[in-house]
Structures are given as structure tokens and as C-alpha cells.
Design a protein with these regions (language model features):
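Generic structural signal for residues positioned in beta-strands
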Residues: 8, 24, 42, 141-145
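Secondary-structure boundary elements
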Residues: 16-18, 31-33, 131-138
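Structured domain cores in non-transmembrane regions
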Residues: 18-122
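Short extracytoplasmic
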Residues: 2-28
Length: 198
């Protein structure tokens, strides 16, 4: 999908864009004092379904893909130690973002950490909207999974053996809401599209 919606010089480069990014979201909901983990929802597939067979596709149909692409680039720039920390759950209390930042900074490379945390924060806000759109106000925390799947090169098309998914593992996170964010407007569009796909 990316070559069609990421039209830039890189589409025609010697090594053109050759993979798809996916953003999946799941949540933990609390009912009667018990937490339950939901199934994964492929937010990218829901958004792409807005574009499919649509002569005038909305820009909303590529948000998850763009977020996933930027996030994966920033995640790739982290060290192995950083990635271990990112894979842990940070959601207890209101200071979990500060604790996560402090722990990541302790492993150095402050520029990569800052870029990563900025993209993670954006994806958490998006994941919060997705989770609330599907599971409502019982959502207490979210987890997202972002991965890239390379496309089989044209010369190897007759013997396809797709490379393994390049997964960015992230632990559970507390909910984040952007100022001015309308959960209701998002839910009206996203939930309707999600229900069509089921």
C-alpha cells in the first residue's frame, strides 16, 4: 500500500519502498473489578478499508500506516537495551511517562530517545482512540504492535518466501488523550468501518 500513498522520489529510487507497515491495537478492559485482555484489532486494515474502491479516498485512510512507519523508524534507532525497556509495561500511576523517559535516558542517546518517545506518545493517543471506539470507556490501558512486512522482490516473484515480520515490541501503556481530541467523532467513523469488516 505504501508505494501508492507515499508518492515521493523514493518510489522511483533504485531501492524503492518495498514493504507495508501495520499497526495493531489491543486493550485491557475493567469490568466488575476484573481486567480482561481483548483480541488484537488491525487498525491499518480498518483504515485501508476506507480507501478501497473509493474514488475520493479520505486522508483518514492512511493515518495508522503513517504512524507505524514513523514509529518503526524511531524504534529501529534505539539500542538493544532501550528496546528491552520499551517492551516493559508502563501504565501504573500518572507519572509512568516520566519513569519511562528517565529509564530510557539512562541508556544514553538522548536524541534517539526523544524522537522515539514523541512518536510513541502519538501512537498511544491513536491507540487510545481505537480502543475506546471499539471497547468503550471500560478501557484501562492499551498495547500496540507495529511491524513491517517486506514485499517479495519482483525477480523472486516465482519463488516467494516472505521475510519474517520486523516487529517493534512495546509493552502495555496508560491511556493518553490529546487536547481537543474527539473520541466520539473518531469512534463514529472507526467503529462503523470496523463493524463492516467483521
Amino acid at each position: 500500500m505504501i508505494p501508492f500513498f507515499g508518492q515521493s522520489w523514493s518510489v522511483f529510487a533504485p531501492e524503492p519502498i518495498n514493504g507495508n507497515f501495520t499497526l495493531k491495537v489491543r486493550a485491557q478492559t475493567r469490568q466488575d473489578g476484573k481486567d480482561q485482555t481483548t483480541d488484537w484489532v488491525d487498525a491499518t486494515a480498518v483504515e485501508v478499508s476506507l480507501i478501497k474502491h473509493n474514488l475520493f479516498p479520505p486522508r483518514a485512510g492512511i493515518q495508522a500506516m503513517e504512524l507505524a512507519s514513523e514509529f518503526k523508524s524511531n524504534w529501529d534507532a534505539l539500542s538493544a537495551d532501550h528496546k528491552v525497556v520499551v517492551g516493559l509495561g508502563y501504565y501504573v500511576g500518572t507519572d509512568w511517562p516520566i519513569r519511562l523517559n528517565k529509564k530510557l535516558q539512562s541508556y544514553g542517546n538522548p536524541q534517539a530517545v526523544a524522537a522515539y518517545l514523541e512518536s510513541e506518545n502519538t501512537v498511544i493517543k491513536y491507540s487510545t482512540q481505537v480502543a475506546k471506539a471499539i471497547w468503550g470507556d471500560s478501557v484501562v490501558r492499551v498495547q500496540f504492535q507495529i511491524y513491517r512486512q517486506n514485499v517479495v522482490p519482483f525477480k523472486d516473484r516465482k519463488t516467494p518466501s516472505p521475510q519474517p515480520l520486523q516487529i517493534a515490541n512495546v509493552g502495555w501503556r496508560g491511556l493518553e488523550i490529546a487536547p481537543g481530541q474527539s473520541d466520539q467523532d473518531f469512534a463514529d467513523v472507526f467503529r462503523k468501518q470496523y463493524e463492516k469488516m467483521r
